[in-house]
Structures are given as structure tokens and as C-alpha cells.
Curated annotation (Swiss-Prot):
Organism: Blochmanniella floridana
One Gene Ontology molecular-function label: magnesium ion binding
Assembly, per entry: Homohexamer.
UniProt-annotated catalytic positions: K191
Residues holding ATP: D34, G35, E36, R93, Q94
Intracellular or extracellular location(s): Cytoplasm
Gene3D superfamilies noted in UniProt: 3.40.50.2020
GO cellular component: cytoplasm; ribose phosphate diphosphokinase complex
Cofactor binding, note field: Binds 2 Mg(2+) ions per subunit.
Name of the protein in its database record: Ribose-phosphate pyrophosphokinase
Superkingdom in the source lineage: Bacteria
Family: Belongs to the ribose-phosphate pyrophosphokinase family. Class I subfamily.
EC id: 2.7.6.1
UniProt keywords, alphabetically: ATP-binding, Cytoplasm, Kinase, Magnesium, Metal-binding, Nucleotide biosynthesis, Nucleotide-binding, Transferase
């Protein structure tokens, strides 16, 4: 087994390598003078079981091309098997054509890219839409960050907690967490826009008065909706508001939104490196997925069961 990484998440890749007691593979991943991606594998990989650790987060296109070019370099160097470990899978939100709009299904395009260049297997975490697995012509292991989040939740001292889904689409995830979190009550934020150019209205389904609210989501992008949800929960009498999410995208004006929000703490995983400005926020806490990903990689390499790691799915 050998691990390689591009420039997207070198810190997480190093932590995974440390957990597996191996060193990262020697590869030069940089740029030519005109900005094109330059890759060279600096060690023998012939017949090897290779894992490339690379999130396709921002800069999304650069990181994606790095991954694709690394796969090609390793394939041409006669690696026996190549697994792309993509903790955060970019373009996952472009997974369908809404009302037959003239738009691409970009997640399918990316899947085709990876399959055609020679990836044998995909390992990812909390795909935004699980059906994306069907876009690939190779096996996909979509593992869950929720056990790590749940473990942290169980260690906290919440006051009369209630798990909150920030939208209807996240109900199944929130319900599963609530059940495992001591069968805690659940609330749902129902978001609706009465008509165009009218501000979105948020209604709370459930009683959050005098309770600590735990918002559960798969990702935080600009944080606008999440911060507005926290405001509504506080208006309804919530004591404190905590947000747990796997992927910290934090794009656009996320810093400003979080800085002025009423969220007491945001707990996220290390699938995407945080910008230095975001790291200065006092209410951000990071959990690492390195142990879980290292064990998953070990199991893939040894042809062991992945599903046995999870006694539930969220």
C-alpha cells in the first residue's frame, strides 16, 4: 500500500499516513510557468496498491485536474490498483437537471473523467447526494462522518438538547442522529419563499424553548441559511445553538455571516482545509476524520468489509 497526495489537503493526508504508520509517497505536484499542472511520481509504484488523497474543494478545478493527472501518471507507471480518496467531492450539488433546465449534470461529467482516466475505486465522505455513486463505472465507498460528530456530541454537556434539521432534505440524517443521541427529540426548520423577490420564511416544527439546539448538516457553504436558522431558533427561546457538519466549504461571505451570527459553536471535520481568516473565529472547532479514513483505507487494501465499520447509515 502507498499513499500519495496533491495540494488540496496535505495535512489530512499526513495524518492518515501517520495513523497507518507509513510515509507519504514521493511525488512532485506543481505548475508549469503557464499554470498547467505538472506531476511526476518519484518512486517505483509498479504493481502497487495506490491511494491518492485529494479533496476536490476550492480551487476546485485545479484540485480536480491534479487528481486526474496524478491518476494518469500512476497508471502509466504500472500501478496495479488506484483508489481515489476524495474526502470532499466537489460538483456533487450539480447532480440533476431541475425542471429540464438547460444545464449540465456536472457530477456525472466528473465521474466519467475519473473512470476513464483509470481510477479503480472511489472513497469519499458524505456525498451530498448518494445517488452520485451510480454515476461511476467503478465501485464507490461513501463513508460517513456522522460517527465522529456523534462521538463528540455524546461528550458534551448539553442542556435539554434537541436535534434540528436545517431543512426538509436533511430530516433522515437528523432523525438517525437523534435516535443514536440518546433518542433525543427532533425539530425541523421549514423554509419557504411565498413568491419571487420575497424574503425566505423559516418556520420551526417542534418545541425548542429553553433547550440547546443541535443543527445537523452535511456541509456549510456561505453559512447564510445556517446563521439565519440560529437566529430563528434563538427567537423561539432556544438556550444555545450548535452546528455540526462534515464539510466546511466556507465560501463567499461565510466569515462575516458566522462572525455576526448567534451560533454558539460550529463543529466541522477536516475534509477541507480552513482559510486562515476562518480559523481565527473563536466558535469554530475541528474534528479529524484521519482515523476513520485510515481504517477504511486499510480495509480496502486488505479486501475487508467497509460496511462492518458502520452499524447504521446516515
Amino acid at each position: 500500500m502507498k499513499l500519495f497526495t496533491g495540494n488540496a489537503i496535505p495535512e489530512l493526508a499526513q495524518r492518515i499516513a501517520d495513523k497507518l504508520y507509513i510515509t507519504l509517497g514521493n511525488a512532485s505536484v506543481g505548475r508549469f510557468s503557464d499554470g498547467e499542472v505538472s506531476v511526476q511520481i518519484n518512486e517505483n509504484v509498479r504493481g502497487g496498491d495506490i491511494f491518492i488523497i485529494q479533496s476536490t474543494c476550492a480551487p476546485t478545478n485545479d484540485n480536480l485536474i491534479e487528481l486526474i493527472v496524478m491518476v494518469d501518471a500512476l497508471r502509466r507507471a504500472s500501478a496495479a490498483r488506484i483508489t481515489a480518496v476524495i474526502p470532499y467531492f466537489g460538483y456533487a450539488r450539480q447532480d440533476r437537471r431541475v425542471r429540464s433546465a438547460r444545464v449540465p449534470i456536472t457530477s456525472r461529467v466528473v465521474a466519467n473523467f475519473l473512470s476513464s482516466v483509470g481510477v479503480d475505486r472511489i472513497l469519499t465522505v458524505d456525498l451530498h447526494a448518494e445517488q452520485i455513486q451510480g454515476f461511476f463505472d467503478v465501485p464507490v465507498d461513501n463513508v460517513f462522518g456522522s460517527p465522529i460528530l456523534l462521538e463528540d456530541m455524546l461528550q458534551q454537556k448539553f442542556n435539554n438538547p434537541i436535534v434540528v434539521s436545517p431543512d426538509i432534505g436533511g430530516v433522515m440524517r437528523a432523525r438517525a442522529i437523534a435516535k443514536l443521541f440518546n433518542d433525543t427529540d427532533m425539530a425541523i426548520i421549514d423554509k419557504r419563499r411565498p413568491r419571487s423577490n420575497v424574503s425566505q420564511i423559516m418556520n420551526i416544527i417542534g418545541d425548542v424553548y429553553n433547550r440547546d439546539c443541535i443543527l445537523i448538516d452535511d456541509m456549510i457553504d456561505t453559512g447564510g441559511t445556517l446563521c439565519k436558522a440560529a437566529d430563528v431558533l434563538k427567537d423561539k427561546g432556544a438556550c444555545r445553538v450548535f452546528a455540526y457538519a462534515t464539510h466546511p466549504i466556507f465560501s463567499g461571505n461565510a466569515y462575516e455571516n458566522i462572525q455576526k451570527s448567534m451560533i454558539d459553536e460550529i463543529i466541522i471535520c477536516d475534509t477541507i482545509p480552513l482559510k486562515s481568516k476562518i480559523r481565527t473565529l473563536p466558535n469554530i472547532r475541528i474534528l479529524t476524520l484521519s482515523g476513520m479514513l485510515a481504517e477504511t483505507i486499510r480495509r480496502i487494501s486488505n479486501e475487508e468489509s467497509i460496511s462492518a465499520m458502520f452499524d447504521y447509515s446516515i
